[in-house]
Regions:
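Histidine/acidic-rich helix-loop-helix segments that form or flank divalent-metal centers
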Residues: 272-281
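ATP-binding pocket architecture of kinase catalytic cores
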Residues: 49-155, 161, 167, 171, ...
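Conserved NTP-binding catalytic cores of kinases and kinase-like/nucleotidyltransferase enzymes
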Residues: 1-100, 200, 214-220, 339-372
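Active-site acidic catalytic loop and adjacent metal/ATP-binding pocket
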Residues: 45-52, 61, 138, 188-238, ...
């Protein structure tokens, strides 16, 4: 079914947004006006509603207020996923003027839910293998010049959220001149690590919460929340998947998956590094960039956008950042800063954090084989 563009639908702007949705549905579906109920919301201003029609069929309405959200990137990336044969919501109707998209309904079973229902690591692993295949498909479909570049300017803007929103706003923590200089040096290291990597399509939030198990397609994994996709570092989506905002993996399991991905990527002629130790370090430093950024983003969501659910996950990112910064001598100043922050604000068990991954320091492929 081709996408239908809807134009010149005038809504009563004096109504609240839910009343506008009701009015819009009556105009678009005059012979079968669906009921609508909240399906989900995300960290942006977008909301999603499940539309239920008289025959009990369902669709999803994306509500993206045009003064706050731009639907065009979602439409562009949706087309890229379709061409790459990656399952994602199909777009039926588009109303850019009012900020509404009608999408296919993938169901209610997310990968995050499915993982949490499995107690056995082997069963969890079985759920992850098809997701790696999706990531490989996405990267193999990459072409320069289509998506925005994930360049040094964007990376630096993201990293600056860490001192602005996490250190200053959340912790009321004032950096000394030397700490500011040291942090900027770390930022430059992380930026160079990212921009020097081979470039592919990057979902930019490729994590279990953004993978659905499609109820209309034999529970095959489908990708959602892809509108922020860019062209950037090959390790970004991989580390987003296994060093997640809401789920932590034992490092032995994580490492096994990273090696599996690396081997498959090499075999499929993706531009990964030939040396796994080099690839692993790129992966870890890319993860650190993401985690410092997310510490800032979660605080901004709390203080600016009044979304309080994210703040409770800050300790997970402190753990990630401490473990990585402890491993590499060039990150020792960041590690010292994180120790200072932890001692004053978080009181996490530092020895437990460090020892949980100590056997993987300075890792190469051959040494990994001792642990599997």
């Amino acid at each position: 079914m081709q996408k239908q563009y809807l134009n010149n639908i005038s809504l009563n702007t004096s109504q609240d947004r839910n009343e506008q949705i009701s009015q819009w549905l009556e105009i678009v579906f005059p012979n079968n006006v669906p009921k609508f109920e909240a399906a989900s919301a995300d960290a942006s201003f977008r909301r999603f509603f499940r539309l239920t029609f008289s025959d009990n069929s369902t669709k999803i309405l994306m509500d993206a207020p045009p003064d706050k959200e731009n639907c065009q990137p979602f439409i562009l990336v949706s087309d890229l996923l379709l061409k790459a044969d990656i399952l994602s919501p199909q777009i039926f109707q588009i109303d850019l003027q009012n900020g509404f998209l009608v999408l296919s309904d993938l169901g209610k079973i997310g990968l995050m839910l499915a993982l949490n229902l499995q107690e056995d690591n082997y069963e969890k692993s079985l759920l992850m293998h098809p997701v790696l295949e999706i990531l490989l498909k996405l990267q193999k479909s990459s072409k320069a010049g289509i998506l925005p570049p994930y360049d040094a300017k964007m990376l630096r803007r993201e990293l600056n959220l860490f001192p602005e929103w996490f250190l200053q706003k959340h912790l009321n923590f004032a950096l000394s001149d030397k700490e500011t200089q040291d942090l900027n040096a770390v930022f430059e290291l992380l930026i160079q690590n990212a921009v020097q990597q081979p470039k592919v399509f990057v979902h930019r939030d490729f994590m279990p919460r953004n993978i659905m198990l499609s109820e209309s397609d034999d529970l095959n994994p489908a990708v959602i929340d892809f509108q922020d996709a860019v062209y950037g570092p090959i390790t970004y989506d991989l580390v987003s998947l296994f060093r997640d905002a809401f789920l932590s993996w034992d490092e032995e399991i994580e490492l096994d998956f990273v090696i599996r991905f690396w081997e498959k990527a090499k075999n499929q002629n993706l531009p990964v590094r030939k040396d796994f130790g080099f690839f692993w370090k790129e992966y870890e430093l890319m993860g650190l960039q993401r985690h410092l950024k997310v510490l800032g983003i979660f605080c901004r969501l709390n203080y600016r956008d009044h979304k309080e659910n994210y703040i409770k996950d800050l300790p997970r990112f402190i753990r990630y950042a401490m473990k990585t910064s402890h491993r590499y001598s060039e990150l020792r100043n960041l590690y010292a800063l994180l120790l200072k922050i932890n001692e004053k604000h978080f009181h996490l068990d530092v020895a437990e954090i460090i020892n949980s991954g100590s056997k993987f320091q300075n890792l190469d492929f051959d040494s990994y084989m001792e642990y599997v």
